[in-house]
Amino acid sequence: MTKTFFIPNKQSILGEQEILTAKSILALVDGLESHSYDAIYLRQPLNRLEYIECAIVGQSQFLFKVSYADGQKAYRVDLPDLLTKIDWQIIKSFLEALLAYTGTEIEGLDGFDFEAYFQASIQAHLADNAARFTICQGIFNPVFFSHEDLKSFLEEDGLAQFEACVRFKRQMPTLQKFPSIRMEKGKCTVFTIWLKASRLFCRENHLFL
């Protein structure tokens, strides 16, 4: 599941306010970057690009998308289906900065609860029984979650567990292996996931403590 916000562009008797360039969009929040296009393309108005993926290196764990919906004459912001509190704080700061520029409104923000969205996203992934693993694109690398990981994220401290899990997996020195550690009754289960010839492999080891 994905949550989308719209911020209508300002309208006047002279017509629609000039659409921001992708570069100007990134300048709304200090440190915000995008590597969706070469720098020369970022000078174009946002509506000439399909979308840009944004993040703050060193803070963000996941990317969020920004685009321009011509039909609605509005800026569109898509949340990733899984994100951390810091990711949400960055996105919210971006929404507020864009709102200050347009002077209109943020459609979809009223009644939005970040933690409820997180829980609903986890439930949606767990409902996909055909998938053994959930793969989310992190800021640099894909991040893998087993069903056991996802179930643990529904516990009382599930969001904190999710954030710790993401930080741990991002510290892996290579893209080739992604360990997932699960503690249960003195037993540590380590799933080592790796990519080889475009195929996904998994090895499960048990360490008794």
Question: Which residue stretches match the model-derived regions?
Answer:
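Aromatic/basic-lined ligand-recognition segments
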Residues: 118-209
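Short, intrinsically disordered low-complexity segments
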Residues: 24-86
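General detector of folded, globular domains
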Residues: 66-67, 86-89, 93-96, 192, ...
